[in-house]
Amino acid sequence: MKMSEGIISPLSLSSESSEQQQAAIRKFSNGSNGSGGGGGSNLSVNSSNSGSNNSIRKSSTLMYNGPLPSINDGKELLLENSKPKVVELVNTFNHKPLSTIHSVHNEIPPPAIEKEKKEIINTISNSGVTKYMTALEILDSTINTPLNRSRSGSIGSKPICNNLTSSSSSSSTTATTPSPTTTSNNNNNNNNNNNNNNNNNNNNNNNNNNNNNNNNNNNNNNNNNNTTSTTTTTTSILISSSPPPSSSSSSSSNDEQFNNNNNNNNSNSGGSSRMITSKSQIKPLIVTSNTAATTTTTTTTNTSAPTTPTNRVQSSLDDLLFNLPTIPSNVPTVNGGPKISAVPKKVSSSKLLIPPSSNVSSSSNITLSLSSSSPSSSSSSSTSTVVPIVQLSSSNSTNSPSTSLPTTPRLSQPTTSYTQLIPSQQQQQPTESNSSSNTNTTTTSSSSSSSSSSLTISSPQPSNNSIRISAFGRSSTQFTISSNGIPSSPGQVSNKDYNNIGNLSNSSGERVKNKQYSMLNISKKTILDESDISSSPRSIGSPNSIRASISSQLPPSLSSIGGGGGGGSGPNVVSNKPLVVKKPSTSEHIKKENIWRQTMIPLTKEDHIKVVFEGIPGKRVIQKFLIDKTPIEIKSKFFEDLKDGDLLNGLTQLPSLIPEHYELKVLSVNSTISNETLPLRRQTLMQACNISRLFPKLHLILKSESTTILDGASTTTTTTTTTTTTTANQSSNIITKSNSSLDLTINNSNEIIDVKGHIQAELEIFELIGTSFTRVLDQGQEVVSFRRDFAQFRLSNFTSTRNDLSQMIYVSSEPLPLTIPNKITIMVLLPGDGKIIKRVDCCPNSSVGDVKKEIFKKFAMIDRVHTQGKTQDDFVLKVTGFREYILCIHELGNLTSRQRFYPTGSGGDFSLMDYDYIRQCVGKNQTVELSLTNNSILSLNQVSEKVSFIDKILETSDFDDYDEDLDSINSNSFDDLKQSIQQQQQQQIQTVINIKETNKENKDSNKENKDSSSNNNNNNNNNNNNNNNNNNNNNNNNNNNGNNNGNNSNNNSNSNISRGSIDSEGNGSGSGNGSEQPTLIGVQNFSLPNNSKLPINIVKRLFRVNIAGLRNLNFNNNEDARNKFADGKNNQPNVFVMAELYYGGELLTNPVFTPIAQLASYGDGSVEFPNWEKGIAFTIPIRYLPRAARASFTVYVTTISEALESQMDEVVSKSIPIGWSNCLLMNHKGMLRMGPTAFRLWDDGRRANPIGTCVDNQAAKQPIILLVEFESFIRPIVYVDTALQSMMVNDSSSISSNGVESPSIVSFSSSAASSSPLPSSPLPSPVGLKKLDLDEARRLKALMDSDPLVQLSAEDKKLVYGYRHIYKSKPKALAKFLLSVNWIDPDQVTDAYRQMNDWALLKPVQALEILDAKFADEHVRNFAIKIINSFSDAEFSDFLLQLTQVLKYEPYHNSDLTHILIQRALSNRSRIGHFFFWFLKSEMHTPEIEERYGLLLEGYLRSCGTHRQDLIKQNQVLKSLHTVAMAVKQTNGSSERKKVLMEGLSKIKFPDTFQLPLDPRWEAKGLIIDKCRYMDSKKLPLWLVFENVEPHAKPLTVIFKVGDDLRQDILTLQVLRIMDKFWKNSGMDLRLQPYKCIATGDGIGMLEVVLNANTIANINKDAGGTGALLEEKTLVNWLKECNKTEAEYNKAVETFILSCAGYVVATYVMGIGDRHSDNIMITKLGHLFHIDFGHFLGNYKKKYGFKRERAPFIFTPQYMAIVGGKDSENFKRFVTTCCSAYNILRKNTDLFINLFQLMLSTGIPELQVAEDIDYLRKALAPGLSDEEAAEEFTKNISVALNTKTVLLNDIFHGWAH
């Protein structure tokens, strides 16, 4: 779609396929000549389409008698060359608020509005002066003004058809086919009347019209001569709901004709016309199909038109027509099909019962006619033959054919429910029609059973003709027979659509399907009757039905009966209506409530399975069945439907349709359903699938066939799906698809599937994830899409074997020790029957091979039995007691690039110091303990893998419903565009390389292109022939003439490039104003298949929503509101809703509010509809909405009854938030949200969190529900990244020195003179050209050097952006620059991508900042993720906690971060995958993230191989321990608790071996029960001692906690480890002890026990209690007892000084609170460390309002005694160490702030908002120099030493415990 030609007109009642259409629009009121006085208005549309392959051109005229988006003024609107021109524009809209809009159901508009309309008409008609309106006025008036409506019926009513027959009067009104000369003259006349202001346009249009045939010939040649002739089909549809006159003629003196010509870029068509005519006297619905060998154009008598207005009005009208909601189009359309040569004269169709309460007139009719003439015959309307479509019965009608039809009943009249409308006796007789044209088609509609089924058969033929005839009845069978080279996808009509005939073209089956992008929570089984539809509480863009909003989002193939996919040319009628609102009466309030109740019905997945049959040559039939059916029932029913439907007629060789000859087979897994009498649900295969909510496709194949390859007869690449009905008993559904997208070659191997084993595996997977996850699998399209994509990823990356051995070693991730001794001692545990330990001394730099050789020699000397016949290669070294190995490099086998290591030993082998364990032992002066064991572990370098058959089924799964299935095939959203660009990168690279060489040629070509832009299409086509055949760039000029540089013949690749820009006012600009637009090379033009979707960048309409009501209002979970409004008497509750738009946590516009409404009742479950009949309009156009924009809604209750809009901020501050919800405005496929939805609100007592979850509160049983309706448009709006279209991602990405692949973006000039590439850095903006003054320079430097918590003001952003080029060499400044970008300005976004590529390369730790929620742009986040992916496995593991948390900031499940996390987790299951699993698993109880984390867990568990068994064992042990821990907590008394503990532990059945969640290297085989105990703290944690799996190894001791949230501890310990690495890398080893800690569930987790340590409280207690606490030498004495010699004691003192300094600095920086003697421990070797980090970031504990902790950190006199006193050298060393460590951390302030910022999404109570991190910034004092910071910290040491409250706190705590 061209940028400037994608005009969205509400009058465009047909949706173009892949062609462009232009329209001339005219509207006038019924005059006195009308016999019905209906007051309606008529519309005629003449459109021209051109197929892309066969050059079949179809012109259809649609005449519609209904409302238009203007008053009945008799004036004309003309669209010419995509630029609107107003002959005499009337201010047709009164500027009233939405609350004044009258209802569609009102028979007469409000008198005030009617009076105002007449005054406007009289004023303008008298003055003769055109009134101009600004774009904003027109846009605002569009939604704020009621539309003119026919008094005979509501605009929302459906056309109700009775008998369908031909009439001479109806036929005479059908347009005839004039000669080409007449057409050209008529066009010239139109141009003379309407285009006086632009002679060039007149000439151009004349040329275009006069050269139609030439252009068509050229286009045919350009399209590789696929067709040699052009066929034109003219279809005319006329609709009226008012009585017809006695006679009518083919033209009227009041009629006016407008023609508009458009050269279609997508379909390679020449000039054609589209005419819109209104006739108030034409009443019947007539469809005429004419086929001729030459081009034809429908014409009527033309009348003169006033002069054309100015360009200002054109722009205003352009804004209007781009963005209006659609008008009602209640016309079931029919594809232009083959000739119908014979139609039975006896017409019979099924009845539809009209509600008796409806006012029915028998004097009007709607007739549908299909006719076609042979190519040699003349196109005369008299040859038209009527084909019956629908018969509707009423009180005034009979079953016999007649011309009498009931008018549409007034929807304001109440009607009965749908179930009462079905006649007890309905019959349906077959109707046959034969075609004598190129394709013979027989269509039969019959019924033989009480349940309906629907069959669709597609036949690949070279022509593009299709006929659809449908009938309604209680039992019906629908057939669609398509003979299309490009498959058409006619939308089928279900039985339930009796009362929804107005939406006939949008019907998508019996159920209303939840579309992910519209969030329509409507039950699939919901049936809306007419009364409900007409009483929609609020329909912006679709006034009379919720269904209208739903169907508006369907693809064109589902939205149109005749609309075709992939080149289909039938018109596409979308049933979207303009805004209507009505203040409901009591009865309508109930109807409204019913509709919203149906919207709120939870969505459940239906248990259907698809059966595919390909026995009919060239056709594929797919039918749906319930899985409760048996195979024999399915086969019998399937073949019965085929036979009853007469689908086998015309086949020379009929297939055998005997059920016994066929079998049901799942081809994707090559498995046959053998038990014919057992229901599918009970089959083992289906049981395995049903656990995962999967239903595989079954194929009906002959039993003799062992393997099957799906038929690939269809060669088309566009896949279409036809939706069908579901029967009353839901027995079957049938769709049709082209075979191309479903081709699967099945392996010839007859591998037997262990189905029972797979069932067990599925049960294990879902037990690991959590039983609640199964409900997530039914949540919608995004979930299904993600699961399928993940399965495809697994299968595409599948290898029969993989190397897991590299995961067993830990190399080069620990910093090297500060001091490396010349010799290290290794204690080696030798294999054998006894415990044999041998000491080996070796050099630290010795290779592993040499050390192992030395050890084996000593082993052979000791034990000849175990070494006989063996060599050193039969053994390997491992860390004693841990699953960690010390291997030679050659023992690892073949490694991937990710597994590559860099050994430093001799001969290319690892040295001992390469291993982390050796480094740790040397750094801590510990003995190295290794074991010599057999080399069975080496088998892990060839681990075999198997593909789960569930993966194969997942890979071929499609969406549950047909509309979603089709949408997934036909969508061409932003993601599809991005993928298409990536696929073409190799071709684009060559284009970029040749740019400079062809620069001069391009300039000449552009000049020629510009000079010829106003010429005819022949010149444009000649222009295109000059393009390079290797890569043709089709440059589209958006100019006032609206000409396209036609269509290219392209031998290798064809890249359609859009040219044009948006000026500062948001208006499109083109070459018509004399400026040449940039040529964008290497970017594929965003083309929408069949024009089914509208690019968002052309929708200028303001974004708006309507808040319709509330349900389940209650204050149960809000203590403030409950206390304030408890009695409901003293304080009357009032309610209002605040709506906000956010992007990256920042407001896009000011908040908007509903009026404050009084609550009549609440808490009773009723639906409240306050007086909120005012749509909320935000001040941002839709086209400027970023991809990740979100809407936030907060419901407030208040005592204030009324307030002005300017006072609402104050009202909010005095109100109580009782619920909130967020929602993304675009779904995962880039589709803008439309239609109604019901939000289940979160009730945590806070206003909407702008970076909070976007999922509903599914956990609450009765949450408050907010009913919101989003505006709907003619077609779904798809996000288009304009910045992506104006730059190209170079496939040859630049590689930095450290191997980081960063995106390289090639930008091109926006200069008007050239299309040559820009330099890497664009010129600065005008503000950047001004010289910086001193103050600005200082301010800019301060901003660029500031920490991530600094908030940029508007002036700051302007300053940073203006001088962005100055700091491009500073990596840290990139984040500030990105924050200064206005992300709703496409030019700035494009520039941001360029700058990001040219900026100095970030370090991976710096890139973490860009993953914060503030950076919402997808490309920016992906840029950071690519850099982060350069982390080593050890570094990646260090930051894995943050990376899993920022998954919550990703708007969609499928993202680059998701991919990288999964890939890295699978590449190293031990170091990354293990913790990745537990980080996700521990939060599966959180409803906000359950869906995303569950999907990732499922994907990982299906991919991780044997690691899943390890996790299953861990989970089993944890469940058993949790049961015991809960039993202990529920028991009183010390002795009883101990008894319960011992009994419970002894009953646990442990696996033979299992890993502990703390560390996968820790392997155990059971518990040493007599060493286990419970601890005497508040939560009663368990002290557990596990028996090591390795004999003679030390046991594993852990603390198992239940009831404690360990997430804060995990974060604190992670930061401690990172601090320790910073210090070690800076040459400071502070001997920290950051013990291991992991959360495994909600309040469940494990902690590592540091052995040989005791708490300070216990040491003082053992030494005498309170008296010992007051004694300074207590700790000194204890330490001397543990270290007998002076040397050992001095060494312990040194260790204490270093560790104390480390924890003093760390606890001060992180603000660790609740520090007392029970939370500080010391080992016998002098290591001091802190535990239990329940409070941090300065959240110190208080007692009775007083702050108990006043010291900045803990440094007591007892500590000072160990150091040696204030005057000792040790104290000076301690102070110096503290200051140095403090300054090292200060240099990494940004990293620590980022680590905490990225954890804001965890929900940790003390880390909720960014302000909580302010303490961290203040503690690190980034504004101080090192000297100032050291001085400040020295003062804090003195303060801590002299603070007496620390001692008092310890005393009180000791007494309490």
UniProtKB/Swiss-Prot annotation:
Its EC number is 2.7.1.137. GO terms for molecular function: 1-phosphatidylinositol-3-kinase activity; 1-phosphatidylinositol-4,5-bisphosphate 3-kinase activity; 1-phosphatidylinositol-4-phosphate 3-kinase activity; adenylate cyclase activator activity; adenylate cyclase inhibitor activity; ATP binding; protein kinase activator activity; small GTPase binding. Residues 1326-1503 form the PIK helical domain. Residues 1-32, 42-55, 162-269, 288-311, 352-464, 533-560, 1012-1056 have a biased composition (Low complexity). InterPro entries: ARM-type_fold, C2_domain_sf, Kinase-like_dom_sf, PI3/4_kinase_cat_dom, PI3/4_kinase_cat_sf, PI3/4_kinase_CS, PI3K-type_C2_dom, PI3K_accessory_dom. Residues 1574-1580 are annotated as: G-loop. One of its GO terms (biological process) is chemotaxis. Residues 145-155, 270-281 have a biased composition (Polar residues). Belongs to the PI3/PI4-kinase family. This is Phosphatidylinositol 3-kinase 2. It comes from Dictyostelium discoideum. The lineage of its organism: Eukaryota, Amoebozoa, Evosea, Eumycetozoa, Dictyostelia. The gene is pikB.
